[in-house]
Amino acid sequence: MRTWPTPDVPPLPRTGAPAPVLVHDSTTQSLVEAAPGATATLYACGITPYDATHLGHANTYLAFDLLQRAWLDAGKTVVYTSNVTDVDDPLLERATATGVDWRELAREQTELYRTDMTALRMLPPATWTGAVESIPAVVEAVTALLDAGAAYRVDADVYADLSADPGFGRVAGLDDATMRALFAERGGDPDRPGKKHPLDPALWRGEQPGEPSWDGGKLGPGRPGWHIECAVIARDGLGLPFDVQGGGADLLFPHHEMSTSHARLLAGGAARVHVHAGLLAYDGHKMSKSRGNLVFVSRLLAAGTDPMTVRLALLAHHYREEWEWTDVELRTAQRRLDTWTSAILSTHDDGEPADTVLDAVRAALAADLDAPAALAAVDRWAANPGGDAGVVVATVDALLGIEL
């Protein structure tokens, strides 16, 4: 699948060894080094292409954009893979409700997402794979699990046998009752007759009338389950194990728990660290496609909002924070952008040295991607700007993705 253009990332001067980039691991509930090796590998779970791109999406992908920028500045080779779930129940339901062919809906929304990511200067994945593209690899993987006794059939469907994975449950660390409730709430079918365990997830859904299906070989015609898609796409894009799997906080369970389990059963390894972004609210409730309380990036931009203002508004909050969007966020971000732009044109000899901004922003991002602390460092300099303003311009560009 075609990605979007890569924004320029200017090189920054460095003296001394870079600090390790620490992130909050959702499994251990502690700060860990995101990628200790020379190559840093990241899989961020992508969109289901309807109602794209809302600010919840943008907030999540901004977190992993910052992570990549911190890695690149530390001299690492970054390999980033993501997906588009371009066939799934919610997409099919929306297409049916609106009378649009599901393929056209997916195509149009994916293109809108590309446009929004370009405007927000997000670094694109090296490989960006649609669920439909991944079907041959998913068929191979599910067939292998079935042959190994790690999966079983229920009528025309194939389910993972979670008892084959002793590590299941370690990613989220939830009790059985909580897992069952969340599984039912987030697309699972714990009450399906014939399953060995209520939490066993679908790997392959048999053909249904009026729904798209593909040749599954010995699996029969059908389409892939959600979790196996990401396991296979991450495996094929990064290899297993890899450094970081990321997404919104609502993906911790069941999606990341299940996809990690599938990866272990397929190749004996999975993500080493799981990182999750906080969820945004609007009008008093979490932004939700089902509720319809979404704020769309494209509509903000169409109304004349500078995309750097949108990016700054999101950066004003730590990526793990749960917060509510209001129009005040944009006004505050626009004032900040105006202040920074004015400051780079008005440096003076007794102002704060520009090098202090570079050091402070680096330190902030190395400490769990602390964007608010990074913005505060630039604010301090902008209040009394000194030194080479070009250093500040390059710093906020390379590390924060803000083009002044």
Swiss-Prot record:
Gene Ontology molecular function? ATP binding; cysteine-glucosaminylinositol ligase activity; cysteine-tRNA ligase activity; zinc ion binding
Q: Which UniProt keywords apply?
A: ATP-binding, Ligase, Metal-binding, Nucleotide-binding, Zinc
Where, by residue number, is the motif 'ERGGDP' region? 185-190
The residue ranges flagged as biased composition, category Basic and acidic residues, are 186-199
Q: Which residues bind L-cysteinyl-5'-AMP?
A: C45, G46, I47, T48, T60, N83, V84, T85, W226, G248, A249, D250, L280
**Motif span ('HIGH' region)?**
47-57
Q: Which domain of life is it from?
A: Bacteria
Where Zn(2+) binds, per the record, is at C45, C230, H255
Is rRNA processing one of the keywords? no
Q: Which InterPro entries match?
A: Cys-tRNA/MSH_ligase, Mycothiol_ligase_MshC, Rossmann-like_a/b/a_fold, tRNA-synt_1_cat_dom
**One GO CC term, this protein:** cytosol
Residue numbers spanned by region Disordered: 1-20, 185-216
The residue numbers the entry assigns to motif 'KMSKS' region are 286-290
How does the record describe its quaternary structure? Answer: Monomer.
Which family does the UniProt entry place this protein in?
Belongs to the class-I aminoacyl-tRNA synthetase family. MshC subfamily.
Stated name of the protein: L-cysteine:1D-myo-inositol 2-amino-2-deoxy-alpha-D-glucopyranoside ligase
> Species name for this entry?
Xylanimonas cellulosilytica (strain DSM 15894 / JCM 12276 / CECT 5975 / KCTC 9989 / LMG 20990 / NBRC 107835 / XIL07)
